[in-house]
Amino acid sequence: MKKVAILPNIQKDKGLAVTKRLVRYLEEKGCQPRLSEAVADLAELPQYAQTETELYQNSDLLISLGGDGTLLGIGRRTAKFEKPILGINLGTLGFLTAEDKNYAEAAIDKVLKGDFKLEKRMMLTCGIAKGDERTEGIIALNDICITRDLYKI
């Protein structure tokens, strides 16, 4: 896995410190770090910038930096590309993002050595129908919540 996309929650990765640290680490390991155009701009690392489609399509591994919500959002946006996601927790407790930011490099080392177990997750698709009218389905990784107030056809 040489092409690695780093996808941070910019509210949780203050000053993109963890992102920058992992970019340097991945380079040291002979990998090709990749960032979204927006993150590359904020981190002042334009050489790693890619469009979102390029980022998801051309990466071997996606690293989610944030919490479970960040990972769920990345899972939803990248589902059609079927790429593995490594969740690094930048908060206090994560169920899906089990790896702590202080051990991110060790987790990456395990992945690069092939010392990991890939957990395939079922994705959910939900759409709303009223008579002959139908919404386009949305994709979710964990759960979907539908309420009356948020949607009206």
Task: Name each model feature, range by range.
Residues G15, G69-G75:
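Short glycine/serine/threonine-rich phosphate/pyrophosphate-binding segments
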Residues Q47-S59:
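Short acidic low-complexity segments
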Residues M1-V4:
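Extreme N-terminal starter segment of soluble prokaryotic enzymes
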Residues C31-A38:
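Short internal beta-strands
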Residues Q11, D68-T70, L93:
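Short glycine-rich anion-binding loops that position phosphate/pyrophosphate groups of nucleotides
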Residues G73, T78-F95:
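Gly/Ser-rich helix-loop-strand patches that form or flank binding pockets
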